[in-house]
C-alpha cells in the first residue's frame, strides 16, 4: 500500500492489458459468487479466496491451516494464502476476454478520443465496433500493384465467361421457343396462345441478360473497390466485403468489431500523423484547420505522455476487490449484493459462451453477435446507460456501473473522499444559554460522557478508580458518581466545535469550551446565533471533538467564538446584541422628561424656589435614590464621575493633558446611561445617547459602531467580555422594561375610513376615464398603483403619529430589535398593495389591517404574494448553495503564499468626494460612499500625493481608518492600491496585495485560504438576494437582478437583451428604421465610422449624463440623442453589457472593474456589505487563462487555453533560446469552466463531469502536483493552507525567555478589565506566532 505522506504528485494514465494482468492475483473464470449451502466463495468465481485472499483472518479455505503462525503459507489443498482477511479490500483479479473490446469512455465520450485519433466519425465507429460494418485495416499496395495486370486479365476473362454463359443460355431458350411454337402450330393453336408463349420466352431471355449484366456490374464494383482499397475505408455492404475476401484476401486485411480498431491502432504512426496535422494547421484554413487542431490535441497528448493508444482497446479487464462490491446476507436468508457483481457476471457469462463458440467453430455471424454482446456487457460495467438502454436490475432500476460510483453527490469523490463521517461527534437540539460566556457552550452530560469516553476511561485508571480499561468502561456505562467528577476534569480546557448546517461560511463551525448541563439539549450563547444563523425553534447542531494537542490549540486560538466577532466578508461585527438584548439596552439608555417619568430625584435647574435638584456626588448616591424609588432610571440627572472616561469633547475642554482615572467630571446624563457605560472598558470615552441596533438619529448611537470601535481599539478578549456584559445587561433590563405585546397595544386609527373614502373617489374617477377610453390600460394601472401607494403611506404615517413613545410596539421597532414600521402599518393601518403570481400589482389594495382582519377577497389576494415568497425562498436556497459550491471550487487553491510579490502595479480606487456649495464651488472633501468596501484594509501601491505634490502617505502604507481620514483631509480623490488582480504570485496571492484580513483587522497571515473565504463571503448572503427579474413597463424587457444576475456575471454569460458598447470615442448619428435604430459613431480621430445596426427600439437607448446649460455644476440624466458624444465602453442601449465585449474593447482592467461594479450593485441593493477584494479573487481566477493565437516556438497548440503565468514563463524561455514567443489573447471564463480547466485533475473530477475529466487526464497522463486544498483532502493529507503549510508544519518549538515570561501574563477570561489594574491599555491577547518560535 502507498504510505499516504510519502508522495508529492499523483499521476493517472491508460492501463494496458499487461498492467491489468500484473495487478491481478488470478483470473476469474466463473460467474458464481458464493455457494448457497455452505455460504463459502466458489472457486474461480467472483469472490474466490484463492485469488482475493481468505475470508477469515489467518485461515485458509479448507481449514487445514489456522492461526497466525502459518502466516504466508499457501495451502497445497485449496491454494489460499494464509493472511489477514483485509487483503480482500486490496487484491484484484482479472477476466481474460475471448475477443478485444473498446473502452466506452474513449469511444463514446465527447469528443470521441478514438474517433479523433483514427479520424473516424463517431457514427462510423459505432457501426464498426458493434458489428454493423467492416473496415479495411491494411492494404498490401506493392503486391496489388505488381499483380494488377494479371488480376485485371482474370477479371476480364471472368466477365467474358459470364457473357458467354448468358449467350449460350439465351441460344438454348431461343431453340426451345422454336420447338414450342412448332408444336403449337402442329396442334393448331390460336395466335393468342402462340403470342403468350413468345412473350414468356422473351421475358425469360430478358431476365438472363439482366442477370448477366448485374453479375458484370458486380464484378466491376468488386474490381473498382479493390483497386481503390485504402486503410480506414468502411464497407457497409456485407456481400461486397465477402466477395473481396474470397477473391483478394492476400492483398488486404479488414474486419469488424474492436479487433479491427485494435489493428488500426497498432498500425498507427503517431509522429507521422502529428507532422501531417501540423502541416495542415500551418497551411490550411476553415473547417479543415479546425478539425486538424482538434485531432492534434489528441495525437499530441499520446505523443507527449508516452501512453500506448492500444490501452483504449482491452484484452483483459480488471476485477475490483470483493470487499469493495460486497455480498451480505439479509435477515430472511436472502442476499443483497452490489450491482457490480451483476455486471461482472454478465461479462463472464458472455465471455465464457464466446470462448465455447470459438472452440466449437460456430458460424461467423453467431460469433460476431456474441462478440457484440460481450462489448455491450463491458460497456455496461464501465458506464451503464452511456450507449443504448441501461441494463436494469430487479424493479427496472438501472444498475450502478463503475462510472456511477464516482459521479455526482453520492459518488465516491463527493460522498466518501470529500465528505467523510467522523468519530467523536454527536448532534442534538439547541436551546438558548443566557448564563454562558461568549466562549462557552452547554453540553448535555450524557452526550459529553459519550464523546469524552476514552479520556474519562483513561483518567479513571490513572486516578485508580478502576484497575483496567475494561472495568473503567463498565463504570462509564453504569454512570457511577465518580465518573462525573472525572468527566469535569476531562472536559476542562478541552474546546469542542459546534457546527450548524448549512455551513455557508467559516463561522458556521466555531469552537467553545464545554460546560456540563442537565437535560439533553446543547446550550448555545445568544450572541453566537447570528454567525450560525441559528434560532431556537427546533434547530439542531453537531458537536465535534478536536483530539490532538495541535487540533485543540487551533480550535482555541483560531476558532474560539470569542475570537470570531467580526465577519470575514465585511469586517463588521457579527456577535451583536439582538432582539431582547437590544430592547433592554434601548430601555436602559432612553431619556424621558422629568414630568413624564422620573420622580423628585430628576434634575431641575435652580430657580427662585431653590437650588438645582437631581445633582449627585457619585454613582452610588444616584443608585441609592433609584433604589428608594425617588429617581427614575431614564430621568435626566447630573452625576459626578471619576471612574469612567469623559466624552472626547469634555476631555479636550477639562483635561487638555488627557484624563487619568480618579479625576472627576460632571456628566449630564441619565442613571441608565451611566450603568450602560459601566459595561464598557473604563478607558472608553463615555457614550451619551440611546442605544439602537438600526435606524440612527441625532441622539441615537448604533450598537454596531460601538462594537466595531471596540474591536479596533481593544484586544479580542476585552471585546468578548464587554459583549457578554452587554448581553447580561440587555436581558436584565429587557425583563424589567415590561415590553410585551398584547392586542390592546395595537391601536386602531379612528379616522381611517374618511381617509380611504377620499382615495376611493379618486380611484372611481380613474375607472370612469378608463371606461370612456381616455386612458390606456397601462396608464390606468400606473395611476391606480400610485394612488393606492399614496393612500398606504398616508395611513401609515397617521398610524406612526398615533402611537406614543412608550407603547411596546414602537419601542421594539425603534430600538432596531425586530420588525420595521411597515409591519406596524400592516398591523394597525392597512396592508396596501400586493402583487399577483406574475409579480404585477393587484389594483385593489388590502384596506384592512391585521388587527381588524382581512375580508375573504383580500385574504385571497394576499395569498398570491405570500405563496410566491415561499416558493422564491426555496428556489433561492438551492441556487445560492450551488453558486457557493462553484465559487469555492474555482477559488479553492488561492492561498496567501508569500509576504510580498514585489509588484508596483495596482488599481485606482476613489477615496474622497468633493463637497459642493450652492454655486458648485468645492468647499471641502468627505469620505467616498464606497470606502468601506473598496479602500479600507488595503496597502498603497504608490505614494499618495496632494495637489501640491507633497507625499501624504508613502507606498506600502496600510490604509487604516486613520490613514484614510488623512487622505480625505488632504483632498486626495483617488489612490493606487495593491490588489489581487495585479498580484504577480504565480499560484495564490501575496499578503501585501491582499491587505488585511477582514475577520481579524490585521494583515493576512501566510497560509490563509483567502480563496475559500472569498467564495463563502459572496455565496453566504446569496439566500438574501431576490430571484426577481424586474419589469420595466414594457421598455427594455426584463432586467435580471438578484441571484440570477450574480450567476450570470460569474459565469460570464451573454446577458439577455445585452447592450452593445461603443468601441471608439466620438459623436453619434441616429437613423430611425421602423422598429430599429441604426447608430453610427463618427470617431474623433478621423478613422472609419463604426456602425451598429438593428438596435431594438423596444429595448430603448441608454441614458447619458449631460451638463446643464443653466447651472454649470449640475448634470441631468437623459437618453442618448442625435449629436451626443460617447466615450469608449459606454453602453448604447439599456440593459447589461456583455463581459466579452468589455474585455475586447476596454481590456482586462475594464472588464475587472465592470464585473466588480455589477456584482456589488446587486449586493448593495439588498444592503449586503462585501469587500471588493473577495470579488476580485474570483475575477482573478476567471481571467487567469488566454487562448494561443500563434504558438511561435513554444510547445503550445494554437487554439488551446493556457495559464497566463505559464505562458509568460514559456515565452521568456523561447526568447532566451532565440525563438519566437507565443501570441495570446486574454479570455474570460465562467466559474464552472474555470474550475474544470484547473491544473489539478483530482479537483476537477470531484467537481463536475467526472468521467470527461478523468478520460482527458488519463490520455494526457496528467500529474496532479497536489497544490490546492481539495486534492489533498481527497488523498487524506493535511491541506496546504493555514497551519498545514510546510512553514508552520515543520517548526521546532523552542520558546524564548521573553515569550515564556509573556505566556504567564496572558489575561484569562475571568480577570477583570474594569478594575484599577491598568489592564485596559493591554493590547495583545496572545503572543504572536513569530515571537513564540
UniProtKB/Swiss-Prot annotation:
Pfam families, per database record: RNA_pol_Rpb1_1, RNA_pol_Rpb1_2, RNA_pol_Rpb1_3, RNA_pol_Rpb1_5
Residue sites binding Mg(2+) per the record: 535, 537, 539
Family classification: Belongs to the RNA polymerase beta' chain family.
UniProt-listed InterPro entries: DNA-dir_RpoC_beta_prime (IPR045867), DNA-dir_RpoC_beta_prime_bact (IPR012754), RNA_pol_asu (IPR000722), RNA_pol_N (IPR006592), RNA_pol_Rpb1_1 (IPR007080), RNA_pol_Rpb1_3 (IPR007066), RNA_pol_Rpb1_3_sf (IPR042102), RNA_pol_Rpb1_5 (IPR007081)
Gene: rpoC
Protein name stated in the entry: DNA-directed RNA polymerase subunit beta'
EC number of this enzyme: 2.7.7.6
Keywords, sorted A to Z: DNA-directed RNA polymerase, Magnesium, Metal-binding, Nucleotidyltransferase, Transcription, Transferase, Zinc
SUPFAM superfamilies, A to Z: beta and beta-prime subunits of DNA dependent RNA-polymerase
Organism: Corynebacterium glutamicum (strain R)
The UniProt record lists the keyword Zinc: yes
Binding locations of Zn(2+) 1: 60, 62, 75, 78
UniProt record, GO biological process: DNA-templated transcription
Family annotation (CDD domains): RNAP_beta'_C, RNAP_beta'_N
Function text: DNA-dependent RNA polymerase catalyzes the transcription of DNA into RNA using the four ribonucleoside triphosphates as substrates.
Any one GO molecular-function label of the UniProt entry: DNA binding
Amino acid at each position: 500500500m502507498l504510505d499516504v505522506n510519502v508522495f508529492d504528485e499523483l499521476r493517472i494514465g491508460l492501463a494496458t492489458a499487461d498492467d491489468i494482468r500484473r495487478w491481478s492475483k488470478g483470473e476469474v473464470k466463473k460467474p458464481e459468487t458464493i455457494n448457497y449451502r455452505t455460504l463459502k466463495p466458489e472457486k474461480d468465481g467472483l469472490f474466490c479466496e484463492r485469488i482475493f485472499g481468505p475470508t477469515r483472518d489467518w485461515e485458509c479455505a479448507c481449514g487445514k491451516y489456522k492461526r497466525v503462525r502459518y502466516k504466508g503459507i499457501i495451502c497445497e489443498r485449496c491454494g489460499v494464502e494464509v493472511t489477514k482477511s483485509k487483503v480482500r479490500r486490496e487484491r484484484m483479479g482479472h477476466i481474460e476476454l475471448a475477443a478485444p473490446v473498446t473502452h466506452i469512455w474513449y469511444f463514446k465520450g465527447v469528443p470521441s478520443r478514438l474517433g479523433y485519433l483514427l479520424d473516424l466519425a463517431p457514427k462510423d465507429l459505432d457501426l464498426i465496433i458493434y458489428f454493423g460494418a467492416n473496415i479495411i485495416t491494411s492494404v498490401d499496395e506493392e503486391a496489388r500493384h505488381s499483380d494488377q495486370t494479371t488480376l485485371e486479365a482474370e477479371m476480364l476473362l471472368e466477365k467474358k465467361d459470364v457473357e458467354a454463359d448468358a449467350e449460350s443460355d439465351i441460344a438454348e431458350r431461343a431453340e426451345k421457343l422454336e420447338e414450342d411454337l412448332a408444336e403449337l402450330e402442329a396442334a393448331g393453336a390460336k395466335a393468342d396462345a402462340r403470342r403468350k408463349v413468345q412473350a414468356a420466352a422473351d421475358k425469360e431471355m430478358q431476365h438472363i441478360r439482366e442477370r448477366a449484366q448485374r453479375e458484370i456490374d458486380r464484378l466491376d464494383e468488386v474490381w473498382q473497390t479493390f483497386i481503390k482499397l485504402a486503410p480506414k475505408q468502411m464497407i457497409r455492404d456485407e456481400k461486397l466485403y465477402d466477395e473481396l475476401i474470397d477473391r483478394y484476401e492476400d492483398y488486404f486485411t479488414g474486419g469488424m468489431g474492436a479487433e479491427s480498431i485494435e489493428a488500426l491502432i497498432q498500425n498507427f504512426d503517431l509522429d507521422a500523423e502529428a507532422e501531417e496535422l501540423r502541416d495542415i494547421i500551418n497551411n490550411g484554413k476553415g473547417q479543415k484547420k479546425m478539425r486538424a487542431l482538434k485531432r492534434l490535441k489528441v495525437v499530441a497528448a499520446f505523443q507527449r505522455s508516452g501512453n500506448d493508444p492500444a490501452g483504449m482497446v482491452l484484452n483483459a479487464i480488471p476485477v475490483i476487490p470483493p470487499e469493495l462490491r460486497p455480498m451480505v446476507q439479509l435477515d430472511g436468508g436472502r442476499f443483497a449484493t452490489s450491482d457490480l457483481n451483476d455486471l461482472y457476471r454478465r461479462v463472464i457469462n458472455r465471455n465464457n459462451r464466446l470462448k465455447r463458440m470459438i472452440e466449437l467453430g460456430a458460424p461467423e455471424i453467431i460469433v460476431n453477435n456474441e462478440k457484440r454482446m460481450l462489448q455491450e456487457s463491458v460497456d455496461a460495467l464501465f458506464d451503464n446507460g452511456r450507449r443504448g438502454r441501461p441494463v436494469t436490475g430487479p424493479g427496472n432500476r438501472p444498475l450502478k456501473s463503475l462510472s456511477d460510483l464516482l459521479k455526482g453527490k453520492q459518488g465516491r469523490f463527493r460522498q466518501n473522499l470529500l465528505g467523510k463521517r467522523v468519530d467523536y461527534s454527536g448532534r442534538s437540539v439547541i436551546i438558548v444559554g443566557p448564563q454562558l460566556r461568549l466562549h462557552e457552550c452547554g453540553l448535555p452530560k450524557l452526550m459529553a460522557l459519550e464523546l469524552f469516553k476514552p479520556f474519562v476511561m483513561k483518567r479513571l485508571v490513572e486516578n485508580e478508580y478502576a484497575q483496567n480499561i475494561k472495568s473503567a468502561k463498565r463504570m462509564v456505562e453504569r454512570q457511577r458518581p465518580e465518573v462525573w467528577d472525572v468527566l469535569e476534569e476531562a472536559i476542562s480546557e478541552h474546546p469542542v466545535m459546534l457546527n450548524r448546517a448549512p455551513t455557508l461560511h467559516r463561522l458556521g463551525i466555531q469552537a467553545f469550551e464545554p460546560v456540563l448541563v442537565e437535560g439533553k439539549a446543547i446550550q448555545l450563547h445568544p450572541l453566537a446565533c447570528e454567525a450560525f444563523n441559528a434560532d431556537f425553534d427546533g434547530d439542531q447542531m453537531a458537536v465535534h471533538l478536536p483530539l490532538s494537542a495541535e487540533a485543540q490549540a487551533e480550535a482555541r486560538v483560531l476558532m474560539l467564538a470569542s475570537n470570531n466577532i467580526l465577519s470575514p466578508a465585511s469586517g463588521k461585527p457579527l456577535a451583536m446584541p439582538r432582539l431582547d438584548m437590544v430592547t433592554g439596552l434601548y430601555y436602559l439608555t432612553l431619556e424621558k422628561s422629568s414630568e413624564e417619568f422620573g420622580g423628585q430625584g430628576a434634575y431641575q435647574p435652580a430657580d427662585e424656589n431653590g437650588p438645582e435638584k437631581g445633582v449627585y456626588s457619585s454613582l452610588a448616591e444616584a443608585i441609592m435614590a433609584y433604589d428608594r424609588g425617588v429617581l427614575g432610571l431614564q430621568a435626566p440627572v447630573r452625576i459626578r464621575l471619576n471612574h469612567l472616561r469623559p466624552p472626547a469633547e469634555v476631555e479636550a475642554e477639562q483635561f487638555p493633558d488627557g484624563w487619568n482615572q480618579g479625576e472627576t467630571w460632571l456628566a449630564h446624563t441619565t442613571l441608565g446611561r451611566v450603568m450602560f457605560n459601566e459595561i464598557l472598558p473604563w478607558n472608553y470615552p463615555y457614550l451619551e445617547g440611546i442605544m439602537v441596533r438600526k435606524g440612527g438619529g441625532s441622539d441615537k448611537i448604533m450598537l454596531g459602531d460601538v462594537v466595531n470601535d471596540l474591536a479596533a481599539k481593544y484586544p479580542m478578549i476585552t471585546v468578548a467580555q464587554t459583549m457578554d456584559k452587554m448581553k447580561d445587561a440587555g436581558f436584565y433590563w429587557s425583563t424589567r422594561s415590561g415590553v410585551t405585546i398584547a392586542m390592546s397595544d395595537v391601536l386602531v386609527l379612528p379616522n381611517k375610513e374618511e381617509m380611504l373614502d377620499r382615495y376611493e373617489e379618486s380611484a372611481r374617477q380613474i375607472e370612469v376615464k378608463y371606461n370612456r377610453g381616455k386612458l390606456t390600460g397601462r396608464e390606468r394601472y400606473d395611476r391606480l398603483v400610485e394612488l393606492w401607494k399614496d393612500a398606504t403611506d398616508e395611513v401609515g404615517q397617521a398610524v406612526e403619529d398615533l402611537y406614543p413613545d412608550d407603547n411596546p410596539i414602537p419601542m421594539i421597532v425603534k430600538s432596531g430589535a425586530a420588525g420595521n414600521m411597515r409591519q406596524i402599518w400592516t398591523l394597525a393601518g392597512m396592508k396596501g398593495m400586493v402583487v399577483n403570481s406574475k409579480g404585477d400589482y393587484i389594483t385593489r389594495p388590502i384596506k384592512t389591517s391585521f388587527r381588524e382582519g382581512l375580508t375573504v377577497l383580500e385574504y385571497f389576494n394576499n395569498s398570491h404574494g405570500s405563496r410566491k415568497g415561499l416558493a422564491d425562498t426555496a428556489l433561492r436556497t438551492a441556487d445560492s448553495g450551488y453558486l457557493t459550491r462553484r465559487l469555492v471550487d474555482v477559488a479553492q487553491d488561492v492561498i496567501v503564499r508569500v509576504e510580498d510579490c514585489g509588484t508596483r502595479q495596482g488599481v485606482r480606487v476613489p477615496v474622497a468626494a468633493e463637497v459642493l456649495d450652492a454655486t458648485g464651488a468645492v468647499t471641502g472633501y468627505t469620505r467616498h460612499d464606497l470606502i468601506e468596501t473598496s479602500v479600507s484594509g488595503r496597502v498603497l501601491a504608490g505614494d499618495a500625493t496632494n495637489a501640491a505634490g507633497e507625499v501624504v502617505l508613502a507606498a506600502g502604507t496600510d490604509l487604516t481608518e486613520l490613514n484614510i481620514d488623512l487622505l480625505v483631509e488632504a483632498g486626495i480623490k483617488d489612490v493606487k492600491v495593491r490588489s489581487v488582480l495585479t498580484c504577480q504570485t504565480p499560484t495564490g496571492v501575496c499578503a501585501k496585495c491582499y491587505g488585511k484580513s477582514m475577520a481579524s483587522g490585521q494583515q493576512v497571515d501566510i497560509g490563509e485560504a483567502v480563496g475559500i473565504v472569498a467564495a463563502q463571503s459572496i455565496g453566504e448572503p446569496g439566500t438574501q438576494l431576490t430571484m426577481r427579474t424586474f419589469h420595466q413597463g414594457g421598455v427594455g424587457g426584463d432586467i435580471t437582478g438578484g441571484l440570477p444576475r450574480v450567476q450570470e456575471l460569474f459565469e460570464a454569460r451573454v446577458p439577455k437583451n445585452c447592450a452593445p458598447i461603443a468601441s471608439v470615442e466620438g459623436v453619434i448619428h441616429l437613423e430611425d428604421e421602423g422598429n430599429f435604430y441604426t447608430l453610427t459613431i463618427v470617431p474623433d480621430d478621423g478613422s472609419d465610422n463604426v456602425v451598429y445596426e438593428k438596435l431594438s427600439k423596444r429595448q430603448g437607448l441608454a441614458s447619458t449624463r449631460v451638463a446643464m446649460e443653466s447651472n454649470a455644476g449640475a448634470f441631468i440624466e437623459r437618453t442618448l440623442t442625435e449629436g451626443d458624444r460617447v466615450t469608449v465602453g459606454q453602453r448604447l442601449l439599456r440593459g447589461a453589457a456583455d463581459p466579452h465585449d468589455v474585455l475586447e474593447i476596454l481590456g482586462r482592467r475594464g472588464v475587472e472593474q465592470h464585473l466588480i461594479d455589477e456584482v456589488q450593485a446587486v449586493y448593495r441593493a439588498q444592503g449586503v456589505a462585501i469587500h471588493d477584494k473577495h470579488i476580485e479573487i474570483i475575477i482573478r481566477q476567471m481571467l487567469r487563462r488566454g487562448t494561443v493565437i500563434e504558438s511561435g516556438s513554444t510547445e503550445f497548440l494554437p487554439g488551446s487555453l493556457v495559464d497566463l503565468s505559464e505562458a509568460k514563463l514559456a515565452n521568456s524561455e523561447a526568447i532566451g533560446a532565440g525563438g519566437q514567443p507565443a501570441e495570446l489573447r486574454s479570455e474570460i471564463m465562467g466559474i464552472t469552466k474555470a474550475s474544470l480547466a484547473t491544473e489539478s485533475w483530482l479537483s476537477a473530477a470531484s467537481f463536475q463531469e467526472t468521467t470527461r475529466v478523468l478520460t482527458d487526464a488519463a490520455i494526457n497522463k496528467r500529474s496532479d502536483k497536489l497544490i490546492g486544498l481539495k486534492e489533498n483532502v481527497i488523498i487524506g493529507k493535511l491541506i496546504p493552507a493555514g497551519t498545514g503549510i510546510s512553514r508552520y508544519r515543520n517548526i521546532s518549538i523552542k520558546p524564548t525567555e521573553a515569550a515564556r515570561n509573556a505566556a504567564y501574563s496572558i489575561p484569562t477570561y475571568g480577570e477583570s478589565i474594569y478594575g484599577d489594574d491598568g489592564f485596559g491599555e493591554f493590547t495583545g491577547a496572545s503572543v504572536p506566532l513569530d515571537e513564540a518560535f
